[in-house]
A protein has these predicted regions:
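Short, well-ordered coil/turn residues at beta-beta hairpins
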Residues: 5, 125, 135, 164-165, ...
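NAD(P)-dinucleotide binding in Rossmann-like oxidoreductases
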Residues: 142-144, 157-232, 247
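C-terminal helix-rich "cap/oligomerization" subdomain common to oxidoreductases
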Residues: 1-4, 46, 156, 236-277
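Hydrophobic residues in well-ordered beta-strands that form the structural core
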Residues: 4, 27, 53-55, 187
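A short helix->loop->beta-strand "cap" motif at the edges of active sites that frequently abuts
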Residues: 21-23, 48-52, 159
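Beta-loop-alpha module in the N-terminal Rossmann-like domain of NAD(P)-dependent dehydrogenases
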Residues: 1-44
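Short glycine/proline- and charge-enriched loop/turn segments
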Residues: 22, 97-105, 212-219
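Predominantly a Rossmann-like dinucleotide-binding segment in NAD(P)-dependent oxidoreductases
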Residues: 51, 59-142, 271
Length: 277
């Protein structure tokens, strides 16, 4: 088994090398710098069909997200109407060599590095989006990658998602609202190593079907332990041992979210022209 935890520039090359050497591969997100990177990986994956390839979208394994997924799939509150999300931190954190803030190393900024999780969750709860409008900027930190992405998207069913991915959120924030026909799900805060995103909570607010003055019915669930990393790796191991197909974080998921990210980048004509996307 090979675990790939490298800068975006090297991740696809290492993944391909692992598959060619007959290793099961777990690669942290993002899968590369651009769409071509993951497409190149998939070509090699198809040749090595017995090997397992999984990408690290660990947010899917947080309990608040798992519970929200169950509620949506149950249909008890009807269909999804829209999404509203904010995921942000106070800077594009520089690790060794500050590669995350350099386009030639990373391929993108806060959207590709952190916003990818929010986009993956929205895709996890719904399906692919075919209309995208965006404003992308690097006006604050002045790196050659984005520090803010303002996005509105629509899918074929008419469901709309609004998202702000930012590296100018001075108080770190994770918040995703999912509006259903009969209720609203609010995912607020997320457990992380930095412990800077607040308590992880899922608040369920039922739609008021009667008098406008009737008190809203709310249920709040708080989660104090993050087992997402363990669940993710346990699932990967189970799929290897029992020769099961990868369900969460497979190469199709990685390709879908990378295509969406580049739709977002290219939707801003100025950004597209500036970086020849």
């Amino acid at each position: 088994i090979l675990f790939v935890c490298l800068p975006n520039k090297y991740a696809p090359k290492a993944t391909i090398m692992g598959l060619k050497n007959h290793l099961h591969v777990f690669c942290e997100k993002p899968p590369g710098k651009n769409v071509k990177d993951i497409e190149d990986v998939i070509k090699v994956e198809k040749i090595n069909k017995k090997l397992k390839l999984k990408y690290g979208f660990n947010h899917r394994y947080h309990r608040s997200i798992e519970e929200a997924k169950k509620i949506i799939e149950s249909g008890k509150f009807g269909e999804i109407i829209n999404f509203r999300g904010v995921y942000g931190k106070s800077k594009i954190i520089p690790f060794t060599g500050e590669w995350r803030s350099k386009r030639r190393e990373s391929g993108g900024g806060i959207l590709l590095d952190q916003g990818i999780h929010m986009l993956d969750m929205i895709l996890y709860f719904s399906n692919e989006f075919n209309q995208v409008h965006s404003f992308i900027s690097n006006n604050f930190w002045h790196h050659d990658v984005e520090d803010n992405a303002y996005i509105i998207m629509k899918d074929k069913k008419g469901r709309v998602a609004m998202l702000h991915s930012t590296a100018t959120e001075w108080r770190h924030k994770f918040r995703l609202e999912i509006i259903l026909e009969k209720a609203q799900l609010e995912l607020s805060g997320i457990l992380s190593g930095s412990k800077s995103y607040g308590e992880e909570k899922l608040i369920i607010t039922k739609r008021n079907m009667g008098n406008i003055n009737t008190k809203l019915i709310e249920k709040s669930h708080k989660y104090t332990i993050d087992r997402s990393w363990k669940k993710e790796i346990d699932e990967f191991a189970e799929h290897i041992i029992n020769d099961k197909p990868i369900i969460n974080g497979n190469s199709k998921d990685a390709l879908c979210v990378m295509k969406l990210i580049y739709m977002i980048y290219k939707s801003d004509k100025g950004w597209k022209k500036k970086f020849n996307l």
